């Protein structure tokens, strides 16, 4: 987590893994000291197994437990990360309220979908030389803001993809980043 505001606490949660070629996964939760008070931020990288929706759903359930601890009722949480799933996937819909949520009363606004609903916002794109040709393109990286009412929807000011152009001939990653400007 990179922040202009001080990190006042941090905690790590281990996520379930699927075995085989899957890697160990964690969620990192921090509290940022913002002018509006502490801001809980949770970031993660969910399983990349192609047929791993079942596993990512289990991992999202752990995110729900983490949010219960981290958010402590503030309803200000931000969730970011490589979820390795498109917006219509069950694991993403669990966070955005499209299905039952992992933390009762906790639903998130997808910053990209709110500010650019007509744009795909592909963060994984075969046009990126680091992406192998057999990987489907799509938006799998997210900034999600807690949706505690109409006021929360106004927190997301803008979004854009970053890292889409090489610097000195080098791409930063196989994924493009999502930059979201939020009112905190």
Enumerate the language-model features and the residues they cover.
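Structured beta-strand-rich core segments of catalytic domains in phosphoester-bond hydrolases
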Residues: 1-40, 44-46, 142, 158-161
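Conserved phosphate-coordination/catalytic loops
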Residues: 21, 54-58, 134
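Short, acidic Gly/Pro/Ser/Thr-rich loop/turn segments
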Residues: 9, 48-49, 151-152
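Catalytic metal-binding/acid-base residues of hydrolase active sites
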Residues: 6, 45-47, 83-86, 115-117
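Metal-dependent phosphoester-hydrolase catalytic domains
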Residues: 68-77, 85-184
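His/acidic metal-ligating clusters that form di-metal
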Residues: 29-42, 53-94
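Flexible, glycine-rich phosphate/dinucleotide-binding loops
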Residues: 19, 50, 117-120
């Amino acid at each position: 987590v990179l922040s202009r505001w001080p990190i006042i606490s941090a905690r790590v949660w281990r996520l379930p893994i699927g075995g085989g070629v899957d890697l160990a996964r964690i969620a990192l939760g921090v509290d940022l000291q913002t002018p509006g008070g502490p801001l809980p931020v949770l970031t993660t990288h969910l399983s990349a197994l192609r047929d791993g929706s079942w596993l990512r759903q289990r991992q999202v359930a752990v995110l729900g437990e983490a949010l219960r601890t981290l958010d402590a009722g503030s309803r200000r949480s931000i969730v970011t990360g490589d979820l390795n799933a498109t917006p219509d996937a069950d694991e993403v819909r669990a966070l955005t309220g499209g299905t039952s949520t992992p933390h009762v009363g906790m639903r998130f606004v997808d910053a990209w979908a709110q500010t650019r609903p007509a744009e795909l916002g592909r963060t994984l794109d075969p046009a990126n030389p680091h992406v192998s040709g057999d990987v489907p393109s799509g938006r799998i990286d997210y900034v999600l803001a807690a949706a505690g009412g109409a006021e929360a929807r106004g927190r997301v000011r803008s979004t854009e993809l970053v890292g889409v152009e090489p610097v000195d001939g080098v791409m930063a990653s196989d994924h493009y980043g999502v930059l979201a400007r939020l009112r905190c």
